[in-house]
């Protein structure tokens, strides 16, 4: 089957069409702006899969309707998913703009004095606003000389932020969310909302009963040679933690081996269901070999599967990580308990950064006073105002141990194309696999256990659906915190010492939901959240505005908030603007 091509960025150089001197004097400068923009984006960006980003430049500068139509025909044939219009001069506003209603679009008007690029920018944005097709404005802070071909830092920041978010929008469109199972333990996020996926993300939902996973395992609809490779890899790399179950619930070596085998099979089969596997066609399973074109998935597990079969912890942890028995590779997005809304936050984070995502329960707020009472330890540094215990039953990406290193030697989680095999091995070495707690998981399984290194910048996110309003996004930038080992042990054992932990300290602003750490916990909209490496809340805000998802909670500096220019016409408070604009324009794909 033909591989689906990746979305490209379209660059639209627009120009003053008056001949006999005006257009001729601007052709080279205008096209050079387009080429410089394309060079920047191809150098600085990659798709989440690691592939290079491609830009498509209009064959000619665009002065009016005819050239705009020719450009659109070219873009339509080359899978252009977002566009950037560039110009150093006056052009004819509504005659030259990109009119595709669902394609993210930005306009860079050169800040120069010789020709009025800013005037075109304002005129074109006015046309976008009047026609109900929002666009992003890019205008440099400082005047440049006409022959200055450099891209100022503030312009570069906006170009890259727009492009990252726009590529995420284009990459999600037309894909599916694989809902493997149904509602897990009444968790609202696993009540999968087809309208949300279709109208806001341009995605479909593929609903598959968990018996399909059972069928694939029982009928050997998988690559048996790969299973042996996976088992050998686990034998080499897995360190096992203590079994905290009562004696009558502990498994012998043969039973434990069977649980491990099925856990690895679950990972293989869920992966094959998401993306397909040509090797299944070789064994006569052509239909199954195609997969479901899923860019994200969720596995219900509890309780209809886990009361009888091994839980999804091992499968989900491996799939969400940037490596497995095949080496370093792009992480998958698989949501625990089929929490599709947390899955969407994971998907957004992965598309924006190319990194693995850490799925976690937002479990406990620990005040400084409570920690001192329980452990005798006084919190300081990043943790001085209290911390949130992010912990779940073992499905977090193993990258979350932060045993990878940035260029300065600091702990981090890298895009998968930058991860060495040694770093992958270090993450595995930092992880223990603990037998699942029988009270929770009667069918057994293994939960990964690691502790995230401290001092690492993270962004925690979550999508929620509010009746009468629609989807909203929550964002909390902060840092992981490292506690003294004895303090961690005391706190961790009060919850579950067989699961992975991140101690998280959000950055406080002193007002609203970020008045203090307690307020962050109190305002979090659900029981789950996602950690994405870095302080990337601004990218999430831009992406959300493209999809028309308002942000109900964030601690991003106001100067970094970047939304379409029309948002400014929806009031003077930027967060109120966001709600009114999203309501006014409605979901991007308006179903």
Swiss-Prot record:
Induction (UniProt): By L-fucose.
Temperature sensitivity of activity: Optimum temperature is 50 degrees Celsius with L-xylulose as substrate.
Localization of this protein: Cytoplasm
pH dependence: Optimum pH is 7.6-10.6 with L-fucose or D-arabinose as substrate.
Keywords: Carbohydrate metabolism, Cytoplasm, Fucose metabolism, Isomerase, Manganese, Metal-binding
Regulation: Inhibited by ribitol, L-arabitol and dulcitol. Isomerization of L-xylulose to L-xylose is inhibited by xylitol.
Gene Ontology BP terms: D-arabinose catabolic process; L-fucose catabolic process
Reaction(s) this enzyme catalyzes, per UniProt: L-fucose = L-fuculose; D-arabinose = D-ribulose; L-xylopyranose = L-xylulose
Chief place of localization: cytoplasm
One annotated GO molecular function: identical protein binding
Documented EC number(s): 5.3.1.25, 5.3.1.3
NCBIfam families: fucI, PRK10991.1
Subunit structure, interactors included: Homohexamer.
Family: Belongs to the L-fucose isomerase family.
Reported function: Converts the aldose L-fucose into the corresponding ketose L-fuculose. Also converts D-arabinose into D-ribulose. In addition, catalyzes the isomerization of L-xylulose to L-xylose.
Protein's recorded name: L-fucose isomerase
Organism whose genome encodes this protein: Escherichia coli (strain K12)
